[in-house]
Amino acid sequence: FYVRLVSQYLYAAQYDNATVQAIMNEALKYQGWEYVYGGASPTTSFDCSGLTQWCYGVAGITLPRTAQAQYDATQHIPFGDAQPGDLVFFQGTYNCGDYITHVGIYVGDKRMYHAGNPIGFADLTSAYWQAHLICAGRVGH
């Protein structure tokens, strides 16, 4: 059990889709970095939408800057239909006036990679994320 628990954080993620692989190769460079509100590049570190905008941009996909704008720019799909590389959107994670307050990258197995504090993986089956989850969003490639 312990080996499985630790190994989930040590493996080099492999994805079937080359675009998703490029997104995650970039994203994993920042694992463990501090969350910085308004951060949108490696020189500043990242907030949630800054991380997604940067990593998708490196893979050649343009995303808007904020979580709300990214939500508005994606095709909304039920979370159960999410595939690695889709975005996952949340509401009410803090009071900012927007409907959508957080975004992460769906990586499969009901997990996301996001700019939490620190940047890294999160289990989407946890009570916290389930309480705030709105949907997944498919980015047009």
Annotated model-derived regions:
Residues 18, 61, 77-79, 94-141:
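Aromatic- and glycine-rich peptidoglycan recognition patches
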Residues 33-84:
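Catalytic cysteine-centered active-site loop
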Residues 39, 67, 92-94, 140:
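Short, well-ordered turn and helix-capping elements at secondary-structure junctions
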Residues 83-86, 134:
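Conserved acidic residues
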